[in-house]
Amino acid sequence: MDAAAREMKSDEAYKEQFIQDYLFASGVADGALKAATKENDKKLLKVAKDNIDAFFINSGVATCDNLQAIYAPKVEQNKTNLDYLKQVISVMQMLNCTEQEAYFAASEAAHAIEPTAETAVGCGYMYYKKGDMDKCIDYFDQAINLEQDQLKKADYAYKTAAILFSKKQLSKAKQYALKAISLDGNNGKPYILIANMYASSPNWSDEAALNKCTYFAVIDKLQKAKSVDPSVAEEANKLISTYAAHTPKDADLFFLSLKKGDSVTIGGWIGETTTIR
């Protein structure tokens, strides 16, 4: 790959070949790593693979703008070449370049040939960017149904929930977040997402104090998030601190004959029972 990097510096047109060289080297390293049986060999090969990845990422080629410029015309020329389209999708996903037109075009072309969860997600993001929510959600549903891996299914459900939340479709967003939880109960992110949904729409009653009780349900979800997933504890604790300031005062609740320890059911689309504290 070092030779490829030198070639690229002297010839800008060599960028795509540099990517091909990276994919080849990375594939060889992956294959060797999978075949290794001795722990020491595995460690050495893992270091080699990490070095290859780091070399590519730091090369200057691995930018979304570069990939868009390289792949946009090539995807158009290779609309029926499934192997090439998969390669484009893989590289752009690896580098988080999933908002580029080349990624969308490759996903749509590949999906027409051989529908997979990954191509469906690419199409889903494309229609999200275009503002067509019906098609966006339809493709994400396809991704969830096509995916065999439980954790990836959960991730697609979570992403669908996040997209719906961004469009203020709260009830539907909650359904997908709950689906993500049912598929992966150890991920705290869907709970945090639901908490933020509740906090974004706390009003369901004519009584201001009851509306403030929504924040108890918000905190319930945040506490659940950090109990199942310690990796989100810091984020959850910050949000708990923020939202706790919005809960009702004892005096507000007194006039409603409510006190600490009482249960209250949050109405509207939330439909959850929480405890006053």
Model-assigned labels for residue ranges:
Residues A109-A110, A143-L146, K179-A180, A225:
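Canonical positions in the second alpha-helix
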Residues Q87, G122, Y158-K159, L193, ...:
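"A position-specific structural signal for the A-helix of alpha-solenoid helical repeats
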Residues A5-K9, Q93-C97, K129-G131, Q148-L151, ...:
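Short coil/turn linking the two alpha-helices of tandem helical-hairpin repeats
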Residues N81, T116, Q150-K153, N186-N187, ...:
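Residue-level recognition of tetratricopeptide repeat
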Residues M1-F104, I113-E114, E234-Y243, S257-R277:
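Preference for long, solvent-exposed alpha-helical segments and helix-linker "stalks"
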